[in-house]
Swiss-Prot record:
Lineage of source species: Eukaryota, Fungi, Dikarya, Ascomycota, Pezizomycotina
Family that this chain belongs to: Belongs to the SHE9 family.
Function: Required for the maintenance of the structure of the mitochondrial inner membrane. Involved in mitochondrial morphology. Causes growth arrest when highly overexpressed.
Region annotated Disordered, chain positions: 61-174, 408-428, 443-497
Biased composition (Low complexity): 133-160, 443-473, 484-495
Protein name: Sensitive to high expression protein 9 homolog, mitochondrial
Mitochondrial matrix side: 545-553
Chief location category: mitochondrion
Entry keywords, A to Z: Coiled coil, Membrane, Mitochondrion, Mitochondrion inner membrane, Transit peptide, Transmembrane, Transmembrane helix
Membrane topology category: Multi-pass membrane protein
GO biological process assignments: inner mitochondrial membrane organization
Amino acid sequence: MSSTTAIRLAARPSSWRGTGALSSGRPLSQFASLPRRSINPSISGMRQGTLRLSIHDGRLFFSTQPPKDTPENMNNKETGSSNVIFMPPPPPAQTEAPSSGSAKEDTTDATNKSETETPTAASESETSKSSESDVSSASTSDSANSSETTTTTSETTPENGNNDTAQPELPSRTEAHRARLSARFSTIMDNFQTRLLTATQTLNDLTGYSAIEQIKRKNAELEVAHGQAQSRLRDARHNYKSLTMHRASTQREVTTLLARKDTWNPLDLERFTSLYRLDHELEAQVAQAAQELTEAETEESRLSADLNAGILKRYHEEQIWSDRIRRQSTWGTWGLMGVNVLLFLVLQFVAEPWRRKRLMKGIAENEKGVIDEVRHELGQVRQALEASGLRETAHLARLMEQEREIQALASTSSSSGDPQGGGGRTEGEVEMDIGAEFMAAAAEEAAEEAATAQQQQQQQQQQQQQQHHQTPETQEEPQQPPLTWKQTAQKWQQTLSDPQQIKAAVVDLYSDRRIDLKMRDVSLLALESAATGAAVVASVAFFVLRSSGSGKA
């Protein structure tokens, strides 16, 4: 095999036009490990003799332009033989999913076949003709294989879908669902925190505390700057003191040398010269240190004044803000008290009568059966009384008939008469006998009626006692109808106009008279007393604080 190998790669579909030709010094054995997917050999750096193969889905192209033919390449083309490699089409896709090992075997088989089926041409013209014919045949076979692959894939897709749906819920899906819920919860919490911070900032803006926050931040910056200025001032003061002490020691040494000027030697002269020069340098350094110290003191004083002013301003603004909040809280407290009073009035004059009326209606419905029974018994008693009255009337009618008969007998006996005048009874005696009989019959009837009435009364008392023991909660005393406003006003007017009634009412307030109250009424009285006491205490405290505040002002 020659050093130059020309590879003609034919594109599979008809839409992929052109062939790729590359010249390289690499042998063909390096192309044996290419996968059976569509291979796109992209050649970059042809001039450097390097070869790079890149895998693309269904397209073969060169990333760079092919190099121009050099005289050496032209000589190689004329003298050497060129080998043309045609990439075979991939086999049709199988329904079963191939494993990684089988994929490697198919790849090596396809590569070996491509090497064995590689024809050799004697000339460049025959190579081009055979490549064109193979391009057309390869395109047709590739289109057929692609259609078969598409059909097979479409047939296997429903089976895979059915297998997916038949599988139970996997832990991965549960974990993904939990991850989505966790992400959603995190998003909700982040939004909540953002809204909370926004609401806090809005509240600060409305109440005017944002300006105080700015003053606090500015004071913090001034405090940091003031600390730095103090450190610079300490350094400048220490530098000034050290330079001053050094110059003083130098001046003392110079004075000592001048005192024994007559006994100087060359070393003393040299020392004096150096000390004099050092004194001049120290003088300049001391002047500069004094200037730096003055600037540091000025800066520290300015920052200290600014910091004190900022602290005073913050205190003043916070005092005003606290007074405003206190004033608003006072109005809010009064508003809450007003709402409580309004609720109390609504409960007492609207809700409580409605509830009482509803309760009475419920009690009336519950006692309707008992009242019907009582009415039935009263009707029976009335019928019994009416029946006894009819019996008494019939008895009186019977007695009147007997009296008429007796009168008739008496008249007949008086008309016939006893000739002796003493053998028969007189009319007065007969009337007395009749009256005695009538009185005896009337007494017997009255005794019977009294006994019957007493028995009925005892039965009614027993029934009432039984009802009282059975339903003590549902029985209530009959309530009098509520008085109107006019009647109440008249009653109060009469009570106030009469001193005796006023005295009796006052004495009755602390008397030992027993009254019956419900627990609900006692609770309402306690709540009313507590509300009244709280209102009185709050009013007194408000007026005291207001008077103290006005006194301080």
